[in-house]
Amino acid sequence: LYFKACNNGKLGITQTLGPGYKIMSKVKWLFGKLAIIKSQNFKHAISSKIDLDKARKLAFAPHINIGVFSLERDSPGWKSWQKNLEKTLKSGKIFGSEGLAMNISVYIDNIETEFLPLNCNWIASNLLPKFDENQQTFVEPYLPNYKIGIMHLAAGIWDGDKDMRLNKDVKINVKTLRNNIQSKSLRFSN
């Protein structure tokens, strides 16, 4: 899908938004209706000194997961991302700058984008997958239980103080489609 998505200069990418996600943004309620927005896009935009109107526009836009994306080599999306990355790196932190730059390219610059389904870039820390015992593969936890193509371990998958990204021996309990529990690693293995 990534190759097809980037046809004609479009960006092929996945948003971090889907069925079963319980929290999209953090908000600190001060009193009454007054709150401080703590969404990833807004927080990074403010620290990167992005114009307040643009930061507000990004505040509740679905965050874009840049762990995997596709762009043709001559796509105008590259210039937009480069321009925005220079801006975010100038005043912000290195961590998150590339993601913020891509979010600005999509939601502010309006580059042509093909949004791909979550199973193309599944963030396991947001929602654990299920395991299909018949197909021996991870699937989305909700019907129709599409097969997961890429498992993204952003934010880590932890067992005590051990992170699965760093320790190949870490396994977690995962529900199966038959309602069993299996101890599995979410890491790719041949």
Annotate the PLM regions.
Residues 1-190:
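Glycosyltransferase catalytic domains, chiefly GT-A lineage
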